[in-house]
């Protein structure tokens, strides 16, 4: 449902943010 889509988007965004932080460091 909608909630699982939101959770998936949040998970993907979290991974992207982590990768971005790793690139900065």
Curated annotation (Swiss-Prot):
In UniProt terms, what function does this protein have?
Answer: Antimicrobial peptide, active against the Gram-positive bacterium S.aureus, the Gram-negative bacteria E.coli and P.aeruginosa, and the yeasts C.albicans and P.brasiliensis. Has hemolytic activity (15% hemolysis at 128 ug/ml).
Family classification: Belongs to the frog skin active peptide (FSAP) family. Dermaseptin subfamily.
**Entry-annotated residues carrying Valine amide:** 25
Q: What is its main location?
A: secreted
Biological classification of the source:
Eukaryota, Metazoa, Chordata, Craniata, Vertebrata
InterPro entries linked: Dermaseptin_dom
Q: What is this protein called?
A: Dermaseptin-5
| BP GO annotations | defense response to bacterium; killing of cells of another organism
